[in-house]
Regions:
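Short, surface-exposed amphipathic charged segments that create phosphate/polyanion-binding patches used
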Residues: 150-154, 287-295, 415-416, 465-477
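Charged, amphipathic alpha-helical linkers/stalks
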Residues: 459-526
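C-terminal, active-site-flanking charged/polar segments
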Residues: 359, 434-479
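His/Asp/Glu-rich metal-coordinating catalytic cores
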Residues: 1-55, 60, 64, 71-252, ...
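Short, compositionally biased "basic patch" segments
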Residues: 191-206, 292-299, 370-396
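Generic long, charged, amphipathic alpha-helical segments
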Residues: 379, 387-418
């Protein structure tokens, strides 16, 4: 009964944990790190084909993004998550694969001009579609037996539609240990979704620490602030452009705008048009509608009881096709445009910025975190000119950033969640935070509750039955890592993605051979002949 820490150790992204218990091998989360890491991430200790199943906390790519790669390497087991997470993961994994393939096409055009070999993507759209077929939904609060000695239950983490903390009971040789994986713990009083549920007990807690060193401060009243910005922008004859993450934040903005329209807080512009210009955001908005009953909070549920959809309203226009998107900027009516990506580095938002940044009448409103090096960060930093589609664009529009909008609990919220445990856990492992933040929050857990807490590095292995470390690693700094390889699944690698895929296929074949032990001799003989025929063809 052991737990191995792989991703999001002293890092914020790439969550992944490997467990062995009750004769099974499985992962909790299988996330992609979209940017360069500070420390090396250890590989999954076994071939993907030997994993029995995967548990997922929520649909964000830093928790699910390597699932298609796991499939490409031979994994074919079930992947358990909440029903809403199944729906969101479906569209987000397809979207991620599409972006990867589009990037590969662009890179290969450059490579061919330079006489270089084609870049081969780590996985294909077929792999993404294949892994989506493995997704299985388990509702909140149902304690489910996955196999002898392994039970799970999902609690609402309040971070994203369908997000969960995972209670995991492991039994071996008559000894049962309960693990609690926090997932990403949500901020309180977010629109639409419930606040985080508070756990009661666990022997071991694996806990996020994204904002473990800070407070969000007093929460502004966003509705009157947003109404004021809309009023002033439309009065000038401009457009309000809102770069927004397609899943979660876009739906929050629709919730606020519905209230603004219902309360008639914007005057003189009737049912002013609001465009959601992102196919992914449109699909996500439909998923929010389909999962109202199990995921919406009491305020949203009260609106539904009155026959009011919390995120739909007169004047809302959902743009899906490229032609529909282009038409938005040829319509001179002052409007609100919500589009992805939230940091302005990709997607249709770049077209809307090109058409509006130069206009003094328009406003660009940022409602999410802007990472260093992104176009969004440059704009909130006061850039006077930016490059879009190889053109220099002057920044004359009003640039505004909403403070305090976060889907993550701050230090106070994290402590409230951890402090809800009725008995002191044997250990708390702090992950999913920047290097120093994980250490700060581990110390805070000791100071506040006398919880024995520590922040493990990737590769650390812990014996859950004996409550002791099997291997305790230190962080190995990465000198230089490019964005291109930062998101790859950590497996034993030759450095050639195509050859690694072949090796993974061979490992899967060995797993399938082992599982056929005890089969009918006639079938085993046929299987052996097929393998030998394949070997004869390729043995050169």
């Amino acid at each position: 009964m052991r737990l191995t820490f792989l991703g999001a150790t002293h890092e914020v992204t790439g969550s992944c944990y490997y467990l062995e218990a009750a004769g099974k091998k499985f992962l909790v989360d299988c996330g992609r790190a979209p940017g360069p890491n500070s420390y090396e991430t250890k590989p999954i200790p076994v071939p993907a084909s030997q994993l029995d199943f995967v548990l997922i906390t929520h649909a964000h790519i830093d928790h699910t993004g390597n699932l298609p790669l796991l499939y490409a390497h031979g994994f074919r087991g079930p992947i358990y998550m909440t029903p809403a997470t199944v729906a969101l993961s479906d569209i987000m994994l397809r979207d991620s694969a599409h972006i990867q393939l589009a990037e590969a096409e662009w890179r290969n055009r450059k490579n061919r001009r330079a006489g270089k070999e084609d870049y081969v993507t780590p996985y294909t759209m077929e792999d993404a579609l294949g892994v989506i077929r493995l997704l299985e939904g388990i509702p909140y609060h149902q304690r489910v037996t996955l196999s002898d000695g392994i039970q799970i239950r999902f609690l609402d983490a309040g971070h994203l539609l369908g997000s969960a903390s995972i209670e995991l009971w492991l039994t071996e040789d008559g000894v049962t240990k309960k693990l609690l994986f926090s997932g990403d713990i949500g901020n309180i009083h977010q629109p639409l979704i419930n606040d985080p549920e508070y756990p009661e007990s666990a022997d071991y807690v694996i806990m996020e620490s994204t904002y473990g060193d800070r407070s969000h401060g007093p929460k502004p009243d966003y509705v009157p602030e947003l109404a004021k910005i809309i009023q002033e922008t439309l009065d000038r004859g401009g457009n309000l452009v809102i770069p927004s993450f397609a899943v979660g934040r876009t739906q929050e903005m629709l919730y606020f705008i519905r209230e603004i329209k219902a309360e008639h807080l914007v005057h003189g512009h009737g049912e002013f048009p609001v465009y959601v210009d992102s196919p992914l955001a449109v699909e996500a908005t439909n998923i929010f509608r389909d999962h109202q009953k199990e995921c919406y909070d009491s305020d949203a549920a009260a609106l539904l009881a009155q026959g009011i959809n919390p995120i739909l309203f007169p004047g809302l226009k959902l743009s899906i096709t490229s032609d529909e998107s282009k038409a938005i900027n040829f319509n001179e009516t002052p409007k609100v445009i919500i589009s992805a990506s939230g940091m302005c580095d990709a997607g249709r938002i770049k077209h809307h910025l090109k058409h509006n940044l130069w206009r003094q009448e328009s406003t660009v409103l940022f409602v999410g975190y802007q990472a260093v090096g992104t176009l969004g960060r440059a704009l909130i930093g006061g850039a006077k000119e930016v490059k879009l589609f190889q053109e220099e664009v002057h920044v004359n529009a009003h640039i505004i950033q909403f403070p305090g909008m976060s889907g993550h609990a701050d230090q106070e919220g994290l402590l409230k969640w951890a402090g809800s445990l009725r008995a002191k856990p044997d250990r708390v492992f702090v992950t999913h935070g920047e290097d120093k933040v994980t250490e700060i929050f581990a110390e805070k857990l000791w100071d506040e509750f006398r919880y024995p807490a520590m922040a493990p590095f990737s590769g650390t292995v812990f014996d859950l039955k004996e409550n002791e470390f099997i291997e305790k690693t230190v962080g190995i700094p990465i000198q230089k890592e490019t964005t291109a390889n930062a998101g790859t699944l950590r497996t034993r690698s030759s450095g050639n993605a195509v050859f690694d895929r072949l090796v993974a296929a061979g490992q899967r074949l060995l797993t399938v051979i082992t599982r056929n032990k005890g089969g009918a001799n006639k079938d085993l003989s046929k299987f052996a002949d097929q393998i030998n025929s394949l070997c004869d063809k390729w043995d050169r």
